[in-house]
Amino acid sequence: MSKVLYIKANIKNEGESRTFKVSDSFVEEYKKNNPEDQIITLDLYKENIDFLRADDLGKLFGPKDEESKNNSILKYAYQFADADKYIIAAPMWNLSFPAILKAYIDYVSVSGITFKYTAEGPVGLLNNKKAVHIVSRGGGYDNSPYEMGDRYLRTILGFFGIKDIETIDIDNLDVIGVNVKEKVKEGIEKAISLAKKF
C-alpha cells in the first residue's frame, strides 16, 4: 500500500479552479486503480502555513527526534518524507505558482528529514518516490524561459531525491478565442490516462 500526498495550492473555490478540475479527476481515477492506497489531501490555504520567521529557524535546525514530529513546522516535513507519491496541484501565478506553495516547500526542505549534508555536498533522502505536477496557465509556456514554476518544482524535488516526475499542463486558458472547456477536458483526459499508471 502506498501513501499519496495530494498537495493543493489555489485560493479559488473547488468548482472554480481549472487546476483542481484536472487534479481531482486524476485523484479519482487513481483511487479506482489503487483502492488500497491511502490518499492524504493537504489544502495549503486551509493549513496554518506562513512565511518562516526568525524563531522558526530554531525549529528547522533543532533536533530531529520523536518530540520534533509534533512540531508545528517540522510535522509537514515528516509528513512529506513519509509519503511515497506526490500530487501537486497549483496554477501558474506570475510565472511561478502561489506563494503559499513556496512557503510550504520552505517547511519541508529540512536537513535530516528530506535531505542531508555530506562532505560531497547535499544528498536527497526521498529516493524511489514519484510525483506529478498539475498546472493550469493562462498563456502558452512550453519550453519558455518565463516558465519558472514547474522548473523549480522539478529542481527542488530532485534535490530531495525524487527523480520520477511528470507534469500535466493545461496552457492558453486565457487566450482570446480558446475553447476553455475543451482545453480542460483535454487536461482531464491526460490526467486519467496518467493516473492509471502512476
Curated annotation (Swiss-Prot):
Keywords: Flavoprotein, FMN, NAD, Oxidoreductase
Superkingdom of origin: Bacteria
Binding locations of FMN: M92, W93, N94, L95, S136, R137, G138, G139
Enzyme nomenclature, EC number: 1.6.5.-, 1.7.1.17
Broad class of enzyme this protein falls into: oxidoreductase
HAMAP family according to UniProt: Azoreductase_type1 (MF_01216)
Stated name of the protein: FMN-dependent NADH:quinone oxidoreductase
